[in-house]
Curated annotation (Swiss-Prot):
A motif (Nuclear localization signal) lies at residues 223-228. Its main location: nucleus. A lipid is attached at C374 (S-farnesyl cysteine). InterPro entries: NAP-like_sf, NAP_family. GO terms for biological process: double-strand break repair via homologous recombination; nucleosome assembly. The keyword Nuclease does not apply. This is Nucleosome assembly protein 1;2. It comes from Nicotiana tabacum (Common tobacco). Residues 26-80 form a coiled coil. The modification Cysteine methyl ester is found at C374.
């Protein structure tokens, strides 16, 4: 990433994030803005008086635009909050069907017949593995879910999200049935944003998972046989971190002091935070509002179709560029051929032997090769 451009670079932003303090970040951004303002003022000073007046008029228009945009963000937030409340009854109905709290029309008879069976535990309630399947059908989340995670995620009953105001951001709540993996009934992930309207993440915090002994999915235990002749005959055990969806609840930690981290580590931290935000926003914006479409796979197909359309557009643009380049290459080749023809003509004209005491080429019209001293130098 280049640090030479006038816009905010990652190094400045990361330094602010590393400080872990909102006020410090604001100061960094203000200082950056001040520097940019100085550069821009130099630009306007170099303009002629008439052009400078026109630019000032444009800046006034931009100010009006920014004021309208601020109102847009304010009204959009209010509108989203309004509809978020309207969605809640629908989410409640979905929860009840998925978890077998209520039965839908047409399924009552089947359930009643199943109740007569001796093994009532075999009766399926609701929609088994609903959230697990929905998340696995999403490309971003599928990469995070391991086979070991799947059994635990089958106990996931619901996912909800809500806005938070102080500080700005949002939180995700994952509701679990009683399960053999951890004690928590709710796992929460909270994102604190620098600006709610711009996806600039300040930090993320999450519930600490209370794993039952030997059930932690984010760690694996390696056992090594003791060396031959060793007094200790017991195998050596070593615990290592491993890939798991539940690492989502151990977000990247931002150091309190920016001096505790070097530039490479800061960039890696920035990448991890962006990836973490991508997972959270995918759950908030895609999975929760369209869960059944992800469960059936329809949403994945739509996503794939959109991706193909984008790739086709990119391919068309690349093809156009390639055609333009080919035409330019052909024109260049034609120009080169014309230059070569002109050069050959000049060479033929200048190939007439000068008067000298040396013997010229054979005069009998035969195409014998000229002696070396007669060749055009």
């Amino acid at each position: 990433m280049s640090n030479t451009k006038d816009n905010f670079n990652v190094a400045d932003l990361t330094a602010a994030l590393n400080a872990g303090d909102r006020a410090d970040l604001v100061n960094v951004l203000k200082n950056k803005l001040h520097d940019l303002t100085g550069k821009h003022s130099n630009v306007t000073e170099s303009l002629s008086p008439n052009v400078r007046k026109r630019v000032e008029a444009l800046r006034e228009i931009q100010t009006e635009h920014d004021e309208l945009e601020a109102k847009f963000f304010e009204e959009r937030a209010a509108l989203e909050a309004k509809y978020q409340k309207l969605y809640q009854p629908l989410y409640t109905k979905r929860f009840e069907i998925v978890n077998g709290v209520v039965e839908v029309d047409g399924a009552t008879t089947e359930a009643a017949a199943a109740d007569k069976q001796e093994d009532k535990d075999a009766v399926e309630k609701g929609v088994p593995d609903f959230w697990l399947t929905a998340m696995k059908n999403n490309e971003v989340l599928a990469e995070e879910i391991t086979e070991r995670d799947e059994e635990a995620l089958k106990f996931l009953r619901d996912i909800k999200w809500s806005r938070i105001d102080d500080p700005k951001g949002f939180k995700l709540d994952f509701f679990f049935e009683t399960n053999p993996y951890f004690k928590n009934s709710v796992l929460t992930k909270t994102y604190h944003m620098i600006d709610e309207d711009e996806p600039i993440l300040e930090k993320a915090i999450a519930t600490e998972i209370e794993w039952y002994p030997g059930k932690c999915l984010t760690q694996k235990i390696l056992k090594k046989k003791p060396k031959k002749g060793s007094k200790n005959a017991k195998p050596i055990t070593k615990t290592e971190q491993c890939e798991s969806f539940f690492n989502f609840f151990s977000p990247p930690q931002v150091p309190e002091d920016e001096e505790d981290i070097d530039e490479d580590a800061a960039e890696e931290l920035q990448n991890l935070m962006e990836q973490d935000y991508d997972i959270g926003s995918t759950i908030r914006d895609k999975i929760i509002p369209h869960a059944v479409s992800w469960f059936t796979g329809e949403a994945a197909e739509d996503d794939y179709a959109e991706l193909e359309d984008d790739e086709d557009e990119d391919d068309d643009e690349e093809d156009d560029e390639d055609e333009d380049e080919e035409e330019e290459d052909e024109e260049d080749d034609e120009d080169e051929e014309e230059d070569e023809d002109e050069t050959k003509t000049k060479k033929k004209t200048s190939a007439v032997p000068k008067k000298s005491g040396r013997v010229p080429a054979a005069a009998d019209g035969q195409s014998g090769e000229r002696p070396p001293e007669c060749k055009q130098q």
